[in-house]
């Protein structure tokens, strides 16, 4: 599931980001599925996904154009929700015939508030302006 800056973009606030933050439920099957999805999307085959330790903020893979994929197994502010609950609420779109899940708006705001970094505060302000107009 895509979280962070890319999810912010999907909800209307276009900002540059140097990474794609994804949240997965850590299991052997999900690691295999992630590897298959990246390969299918033409991003590359990252064999080390099968065995690497996922440490939030530290586990990333360099993709094309120096873009990083940051893999997280927990999200600050969302500890009281299971991965399945968040997945059920996710916004889904297709990119190159591949379903891509984005953290739902409400939980994205919750996670941004919990992170409380300057860029997260700006994201919240801009998203709230955009969504008040709708």
Q: Predicted regions: what is each one?
A:
Residues 1-134:
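Compositionally biased terminal segments of proteins
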């Amino acid at each position: 599931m895509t979280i962070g800056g890319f999810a912010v973009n999907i909800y209307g606030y276009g900002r540059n980001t140097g990474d794609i933050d994804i949240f997965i439920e850590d299991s052997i099957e999900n690691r295999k599925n992630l590897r298959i999805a990246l390969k299918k999307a033409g991003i590359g085959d990252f064999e080390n996904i099968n065995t690497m330790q996922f440490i939030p903020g530290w586990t990333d893979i360099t993709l094309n154009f120096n873009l990083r994929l940051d893999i997280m197994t927990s999200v600050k502010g969302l500890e009281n929700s299971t991965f399945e609950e968040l997945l059920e609420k996710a916004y889904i779109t297709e990119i190159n015939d591949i379903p891509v899940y984005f953290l739902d708006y409400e939980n994205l705001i919750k996670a941004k508030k919990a992170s409380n970094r300057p860029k997260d505060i700006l994201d919240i302000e801009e998203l709230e302006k955009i969504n008040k107009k709708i």
